[in-house]
Amino acid sequence: MISSSSCMFFLVFAFFLISPVRSSDVEALLSLKSSIDPSNSIPWRGTDPCNWEGVKKCMKGRVSKLVLENLNLSGSLNGKSLNQLDQLRVLSFKGNSLSGSIPNLSGLVNLKSLYLNDNNFSGEFPESLTSLHRLKTVVLSRNRFSGKIPSSLLRLSRLYTFYVQDNLFSGSIPPLNQATLRFFNVSNNQLSGHIPPTQALNRFNESSFTDNIALCGDQIQNSCNDTTGITSTPSAKPAIPVAKTRSRTKLIGIISGSICGGILILLLTFLLICLLWRRKRSKSKREERRSKRVAESKEAKTAETEEGTSDQKNKRFSWEKESEEGSVGTLVFLGRDITVVRYTMDDLLKASAETLGRGTLGSTYKAVMESGFIITVKRLKDAGFPRMDEFKRHIEILGRLKHPNLVPLRAYFQAKEECLLVYDYFPNGSLFSLIHGSKVSGSGKPLHWTSCLKIAEDLAMGLVYIHQNPGLTHGNLKSSNVLLGPDFESCLTDYGLSDLHDPYSIEDTSAASLFYKAPECRDLRKASTQPADVYSFGVLLLELLTGRTSFKDLVHKYGSDISTWVRAVREEETEVSEELNASEEKLQALLTIATACVAVKPENRPAMREVLKMVKDARAEAALFSFNSSDHSPGRWSDTIQSLPREDHMSI
């Protein structure tokens, strides 16, 4: 009888002769299978490993995507076998019963996405992962990992998703500050200390940090102080008992600290009394309040552009509550939704403010009320509208618009010289930040075609709903006016506000905003139209496909060659060159839609309802293609955002 080792030798030798995949990959796969598949759950048969279950993609004769999910695998990972697969881009063992520690994976130099969630892995965080400089996605949730989360994660400059929830990690959170970081969850561990107030970690709300031992920080509305015993240094170590010979020094230090602390408390109390007196005095003097408004207005003119953000947090709103004649303005809620949280103008005036952006129509703020409730407030630039009744009617029309792909307008405030619009707050950011990150240069990553189709369908449905109202348009469609909802659906904001803009204003429009507009509407004195919205939709679709913002008139520049330009950009920017060949039909469908929308003549553009039908047809064909190819694996970096359902996305 031939031994099992002899069979393995002959099998590997046969693959070396006839397989298009390099023999080392074949040997590595078979060795890996022997360590994690004792029940033979993986039916690897045939002569071409690229057709084996779980081998989702091969590039130039090398395995680049291995996805072995929910196959009842057990045992532990073989580091030697895995490191031989050095061309892997995606590796997933999600939803099995694998155990043990993670071996050294420093040989996977091309790895971009690692999914080890929902297993029984234990041990410390695999330090070798921090040397994989191309790594973007790390998902280790729902295992038994322990120890500290290493600060060496800062070396992963492309880190996009970091999920380690439901483990036993302890210590502090490292000060991650990658501009690319968009998804983060460390909840349900044993972490403690100060959550680092980095720009990257400040994006995430309390749900990313809940159920830990003793975390504190602005993100979870739990301030750090001496009484909690929590220090503000991420690398802080437990206190070491002081020897008896040094007890006197310690006592002197305690006494000195108490005296200094007492003096500091007295100074703070005095300062607080002064501030309260000044605030009371300012309320009684109208001119002092008006001077603050003027100062804020001047500041706005020198601030960043509409995609920029301000770090001037926790400032109080200084808008007026009364008009010059003394008539009190009113905060009016729109609609009759009893589930909407109600608040007063006084609550709004006491809210702390963070500038989210400044645009041609006004400034947008994140307002955090004393109760902790968060809203978005848009302060319109041209506060003195000559026809207030007309303004009120228009806003009430917008307030009646209710659709899953529209950011709801909840309330408005009007006085003679002040107009505010109140929207729901969307913490997941904008489509602009999704594509371009923190860059303002307008150059970002093209999204995968599945993501483009999902976003396009969301936006098309929102626009069709708006266009059902005769004469109503969005009027200012661009990626910064698309927000990501709680389920990462794309939602339109700032819709219908272009009619409120003063057409004779000398305020300049940025180039990026200008070239989203149809040629016939670039003269701001001309009213926006529904065909112009279709044109803007086409430009936005080109931005999704190329990652390039419209700082130039791309349609005029490339004309009939725009499809060639899009393909060239995607071939240059996408890291897997075979993507275009694998999805040519899908890309062509998107290009057909985009080029139809950006027709120079308005009468040649399809109606938004026709555009929606084209997008839905393309998505249906794409879904059929995905089903037939059995490719349900974790996607590229952009797929993890839009193409996955919310429950899958947040639970990986």
From Swiss-Prot:
GO cellular component, one term: plasma membrane
Gene Ontology MF terms in the entry: ATP binding; protein kinase activity
Positions with a binding annotation for ATP: 356-364, 378
InterPro entries, alphabetized: Kinase-like_dom_sf (IPR011009), Leu-rich_rpt (IPR001611), Leu-rich_rpt_4 (IPR025875), LRR_dom_sf (IPR032675), LRR_N_plant-typ (IPR013210), PRK1-6/SRF4-like (IPR046959), Prot_kinase_dom (IPR000719), TM_ErbB1 (IPR049328)
Keywords of the record: ATP-binding, Cell membrane, Glycoprotein, Leucine-rich repeat, Membrane, Nucleotide-binding, Phosphoprotein, Receptor, Repeat, Signal, Transmembrane, Transmembrane helix
UniProt signal peptide: 1-23
Domain Protein kinase span(s) in chain numbering: 350-624
Annotated stretches, region: Disordered: 286-321, 630-652
Segments crossing the lipid bilayer: 257-277
Keyword GTP-binding on entry: no
Modified residues (Phosphoserine): 352, 430, 433
Protein name, per record: Inactive leucine-rich repeat receptor-like serine/threonine-protein kinase At1g60630
LRR repeats (start-end): 64-84, 85-108, 109-132, 134-156, 158-178, 179-203
Cellular localisation: Cell membrane
Superkingdom per UniProt: Eukaryota
Family (UniProt): Belongs to the protein kinase superfamily. Ser/Thr protein kinase family.
Free-text note on domains in this protein's UniProt record: The protein kinase domain is predicted to be catalytically inactive.
Membrane topology qualifier: Single-pass type I membrane protein
Keyword tRNA processing: no
Glycosylation sites (chain numbering): 72, 104, 120, 185, 205, 225
Residue intervals on the Extracellular side: 24-256
Chain ranges on the Cytoplasmic side, renumbered to this chain: 278-652
Main location: membrane
